[in-house]
Amino acid sequence: MRSLNLARYALSACAAAAIVSGCGGSQPLAGPAMMPQQARSAPHTVPEWKARGQARSACPEVVGKPTCFALIKTKGASPACIGSSCGWAPLDLQTRYKLPIAKGAGQIVAIVDAGDNPSAASDLSTYRTQFGLGTAVFSKYNQEGQQGNYPTYTGWSVEIDLDIEMVSATCPKCTIFLVEANSSDNADLEAAEAEAVTLGAHIVSNSWGCYGSISCVGQSYFDTPGVAYLAATGDAGLNQMGAPAALASVAAIGGTQLAKNGSQYSETIWSGAGGGCVTGIAKPKWQHDNVCSARAAADGSAEAGCSPGVSEFDSFDGGWFGVCGTSAASPIVAGAFGLAGNATKQNGGRTFWLRKHRKHLYDVCSSQCLFSTYSYGGGWGSPNGLGAL
């Protein structure tokens, strides 16, 4: 059994509250996992992406309330970048994850975000044209299911474009529904989550969450039979994640750092990836580890690192730029679920935990594995084809 290099991985842990106010100290992550409810008062280190000035948060950094997780690169990206010069392109993701992109037609992937991005459709068109992905099958709705009467802008436009573009990158033929909640209040996001299912989506991706709270949204809104719910684990490192990723009915998607040497890709755990032993959430029957007595997260993972991040086009916020964070990972994997076409058979993150699926997931934790090829930040790894989905 491989052991987790706790001292090294502890560098990633920082509650959002500490990100805002500045962390006053550090605490190694040895010993029992910290309860998410304790995140406000415990000392933490600053996440590496913030300490190195690699990125900034696209949304307000708050604790206990829903916020988007998208990070905008501030280091290593040219202000005049275009397309693949801003970060990883769709072809990189398709190649690394061995995705058969001719599949996915008719599969509906819903994105739930807060507030309106008035240029979402045109931005998606620009992104897809740049990378030769063809015309999108895309619809935008408000939380009542109307194609109009959209909410006001809430600052989530970067997140919105990132989400719909990453689904396009990994499943160009998937149908994409963007469901915009009236605000980032939990009740509005819950309403949008329910509406996504009413509209017919069997895959729902959420690149937002509540740092330090496992109860900020109702579990019932993320537990519909025949629907695969995915959620990003956040970018504050170990033991800071909350709902919806913490919920047992949701596939918690952590983050990796993708790299390329010549024509060969590789991945390691991204230092900012959220995850941990989620005290307060009962351990699902499909989790079989003896390391965490509660719900362990993440379940799976995909590219989230900021070196170089992924390319995004968002005219509302200036055009082309690089973005990173687990906000990218959740829709990347959601698109892969669309290709697999098995969403109606999913049960939270169970598919990642099946032993027979290990060969279809890249081992991303190396010396940082808790057991076998599992780690909190990276789960059981990233897709190696569709066999694990």
Where in this protein do the model-derived segments appear?
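Bacterial N-terminal signal peptides that target proteins for export
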Residues: 1-11
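Substrate-binding/charge-relay-adjacent region of secreted/lumenal peptidase catalytic domains
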Residues: 31-255, 276-324, 330, 341-350, ...
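Phosphate/diphosphate-binding glycine-rich loops and adjacent basic-rich segments that engage nucleotide
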Residues: 263-274
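C-terminal motif of bacterial Sec signal peptides marking the signal peptidase cleavage site
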Residues: 19-22
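Bacterial signal peptide processing site
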Residues: 24-27
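Short acidic, Gly/Pro-enriched loop/turn segments at secondary-structure junctions
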Residues: 186, 259-265
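Walker A/P-loop NTP-binding active-site region of P-loop NTPases
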Residues: 336
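Short acidic, Pro/Gly- and aromatic-enriched capping/linker segments at domain boundaries
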Residues: 366-374
